[in-house]
Regions:
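Short edge beta-strands and adjacent turn/loop segments
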Residues: 46-88, 122-132, 184-215, 243-257
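Extended, hydrophobic interaction surfaces within ordered domains
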Residues: 78-138
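N-proximal, solvent-exposed amphipathic alpha-helical segments enriched in charged/polar residues
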Residues: 16-71, 161-196, 267
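Short, non-transmembrane amphipathic alpha-helical segments
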Residues: 39, 43, 95-114, 219-240
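Extended, charged low-complexity segments
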Residues: 215, 225-237, 254, 258-268
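Surface-exposed beta-loop interaction hotspot
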Residues: 113, 117-184
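Actinobacteria-biased recognition of intrinsically disordered, low-complexity terminal regions
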Residues: 1-26, 72, 135-160, 252-268
Length: 268
């Protein structure tokens, strides 16, 4: 039991923080690991830059909002986010110029390509090099936050819809979510099924939480919005109250092919 508990804790740490996507009414979160991997890939394209670490969290002293739906356990509330990055740079170009490009790249990609409400990027230079390193794979938080083999296997497995214990309503909603364009597959993280359904009586209603991966060519926030709409509509069957849906994105391959999306920091 102790080993299983330790493994569960490690898997949770691998995911990092659960970051809000969009605004309070979007009901969507993304794992810090997925966001960091995406930002690390685009930062690697900046000449002379090698990321050493990259973290994303709530911006200090900034207001937060109450989400419109129940968030995943331990998820950050909707609000402004900040990026913290440590990097090494080449002296081939002026350091301020390199830092400005890295900052604008990280902020722009986080906001436009992912849907994160990032407002600042704090950078720290850890080393300066005379010449650019050749043939070296950029070291980013993608490697620093690499999942354990067991966690990776769970997140890389095929969709579990229609198999095992996925029965009845849960199976139906899983099929609905998996069928939304842009959903690469449903994922099992945080020690739970890809789709969780909970009915409550006071007030009457139903809450669904969906964990998924976003495929290439699709914007994470747009996909999540479509999933929430489709699942909420399907989940109203045989329930006396409304259905609310929260989405957690655990992986995204949506990079360089997606179009920007509007991120709302206040309710619509």
């Amino acid at each position: 039991m102790t080993e299983a508990w330790t493994q569960a804790v490690r898997s949770q740490l691998d995911l990092g923080r659960l970051l809000p996507l969009g605004g309070p009414h979007d009901g969507t979160w993304i794992t810090e690991q997925a966001a960091v991997q995406a930002l690390g890939r685009t930062a690697a394209e900046i000449p002379g830059v090698r990321l050493e670490s990259l973290r994303i969290g709530s911006a200090p002293l900034q207001p937060v909002s109450e989400p419109a739906v129940r968030p995943p356990a331990s998820a950050l509330p909707p609000g402004s986010l900040t990026i913290e990055a440590a990097f090494t740079a080449s002296l081939v170009r002026p350091l301020p110029e390199t830092a400005d490009e890295l900052r604008s790249t990280l902020l722009g990609a986080a906001t436009e390509r992912l849907g994160l409400a990032t407002v600042t990027a704090d950078l720290r230079v850890t080393d300066l090099r005379e010449v650019p390193e050749a043939g070296v794979t950029p070291r980013t938080a993608e490697t620093a936050m690499r999942p354990t083999p067991e966690a990776a296997a769970a997140r890389n497995s095929p969709p579990v819809t229609g198999t095992g214990s996925m029965r009845g309503l849960v199976r139906e909603l899983a099929d609905v979510a998996a069928g939304v364009p842009g959903v690469a597959r449903l994922t099992a993280v945080l020690g739970s099924r890809p789709v969780r359904v909970e009915d409550h009586d006071d007030p009457p209603g139903r809450h669904i939480e969906v964990h998924l991966a976003v495929g290439p060519g699709h914007h994470p926030l747009k996909v999540a919005r479509a999933v929430r709409e489709a699942v909420a509509e399907a989940a109203t069957t045989h329930t006396p109250g409304p259905a609310t849906v929260a989405v957690l994105i655990t992986e995204t391959a949506a990079w360089r092919q997606t179009s920007p999306v509007t991120v709302l920091s206040t309710p619509q």
